[in-house]
């Protein structure tokens, strides 16, 4: 598909919001010695790296990979866990870090899986949220930006494995 990418949220806006989220998360977990950031790969890795630096607490990082997209622009209901956590989260404060919440299906499944492992708490932080697309209600504690139902890329979010490196959030605009 031929397309262009238009800036939707600037690099400066993204970085300012990540710093704000870092402050909020730091306040919430002040005194916790067991905060584990769980990044959902691949899309969250850029956001997670920036957020990890913005959180002024000692914390661990771990990653999971789940897939519901493939190389299309549409989310499917089929959620597959491709990589699980390396470490045990029992008794720990878990912060799931997501790039974008669309239908909520993937995140809901991951939240269910992690809940069975008996963490002390589970919170969710996402860079982008598309509330109009939600099929499953998932409690989201920290939202960078609520956006309309547009296909977006940048700050780790891809289209067919491209554009993850963009420092801004861009809207993919199909060309005829």
Curated annotation (Swiss-Prot):
Q: What is its main location?
A: cytoplasm
Name the Gene3D superfamilies for this protein. Answer: 3.40.50.2020
Q: What is its EC number?
A: 2.4.2.8
Under the heading Pfam families, the entry gives:
Pribosyltran
Cellular localisation: Cytoplasm
Q: Name one GO biological process term.
A: guanine salvage
**Keyword Protease belongs to the record:** no
Question: How would you summarize the oligomeric state and partners of this protein?
Answer: Homotetramer.
What is the role of this chain?
Purine salvage pathway enzyme which catalyzes the transfer of the ribosyl-5-phosphate group from 5-phospho-alpha-D-ribose 1-diphosphate (PRPP) to the N9 position of hypoxanthine to yield IMP (inosine 5'-monophosphate). To a lesser extent, can also act on guanine leading to GMP, but shows a highly less efficient activity with xanthine.
Name by which UniProt lists this protein: Hypoxanthine phosphoribosyltransferase
Gene it is expressed from: hpt
């Amino acid at each position: 598909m031929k397309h262009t990418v238009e800036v939707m949220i600037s690099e400066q806006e993204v970085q300012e919001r990540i710093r704000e989220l870092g402050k909020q998360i730091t306040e919430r977990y002040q005194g916790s010695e067991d905060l584990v950031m769980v990044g959902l790969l691949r899309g969250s890795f850029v956001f997670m790296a920036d957020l990890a630096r913005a959180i002024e607490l000692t914390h661990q990082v771990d990653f999971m990979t789940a897939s519901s997209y493939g190389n299309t622009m549409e989310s499917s209901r089929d959620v597959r866990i491709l990589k699980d956590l390396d470490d045990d989260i029992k008794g720990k404060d878990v912060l799931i870090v997501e790039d974008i919440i669309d239908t909520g299906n993937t995140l809901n499944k991951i939240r269910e899986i992690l809940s069975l492992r008996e963490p002390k708490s589970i919170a969710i932080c996402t860079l982008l949220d598309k509330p109009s697309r939600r099929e499953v209600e998932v409690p989201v504690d920290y939202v960078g930006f609520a956006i309309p139902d547009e296909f977006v890329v940048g700050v780790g979010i891809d289209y067919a494995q491209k554009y993850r490196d963009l420092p801004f959030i861009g809207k993919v605009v199909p060309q005829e």
